[in-house]
Amino acid sequence: MAKKVDGYIKLQVAAGAANPSPPVGPALGQKGVNIMEFCKAFNARTEKFEKGMPIPVVITVYTDRSFTFETKTPPASFLLLKAAGLKSGSGRPNTEKVGTIKRSAVQEIAETKATDMTGADIEAMTRSIEGTARSMGLVVED
């Protein structure tokens, strides 16, 4: 028989840097999950990512206080800034452009995010990522 689900916790944690301090500790503590067990498992699973890269994670907590978790791909905004070599996007993206990014780089990001996105095809996902780039003040070039 399947375990009964007590709840879900969605967090964004830096790869290889999960520790009991906020936001991880309080979120897991409310559900009675062993915080150190999660931190060790998360850090082991995310060691292949660049250290400090934000990784979305969905933690499923069961009534017996056990848990499973699923890691997602890094946010598109983070990948776009990394590809463009920038620290942050524009505060006024319509008037103030902060950088440029090649369409091929946008396509690579769309392929990376394909497992988490609900696009019909790779072109639709690429257009979605291009929209994110424009909203951050990046110009997409061919």
UniProtKB/Swiss-Prot annotation:
Assembly behavior: Part of the ribosomal stalk of the 50S ribosomal subunit. Interacts with L10 and the large rRNA to form the base of the stalk. L10 forms an elongated spine to which L12 dimers bind in a sequential fashion forming a multimeric L10(L12)X complex.
Record-linked InterPro entries: Ribosomal_uL11 (IPR000911), Ribosomal_uL11_bac-typ (IPR006519), Ribosomal_uL11_C (IPR020783), Ribosomal_uL11_C_sf (IPR036769), Ribosomal_uL11_CS (IPR020785), Ribosomal_uL11_N (IPR020784), Ribosomal_uL11_N_sf (IPR036796)
Species whose genome carries this gene: Shewanella sediminis (strain HAW-EB3)
Record keywords, A-Z: Methylation, Ribonucleoprotein, Ribosomal protein, RNA-binding, rRNA-binding
One Gene Ontology term, aspect cellular component: cytosolic large ribosomal subunit
Range of residues in the leader sequence: none
GO biological process: translation
PROSITE patterns in the record: RIBOSOMAL_L11
Name of the protein this chain belongs to: Large ribosomal subunit protein uL11
Post-translational events: One or more lysine residues are methylated.
Role noted for this protein: Forms part of the ribosomal stalk which helps the ribosome interact with GTP-bound translation factors.
Record Gene3D superfamilies: Ribosomal protein L11, C-terminal domain, Ribosomal protein L11/L12, N-terminal domain
Family, similarity comment: Belongs to the universal ribosomal protein uL11 family.
Annotated GO MF terms: large ribosomal subunit rRNA binding; structural constituent of ribosome
SMART domains in the record: RL11
Pfam families in alphabetical order: Ribosomal_L11 (PF00298), Ribosomal_L11_N (PF03946)
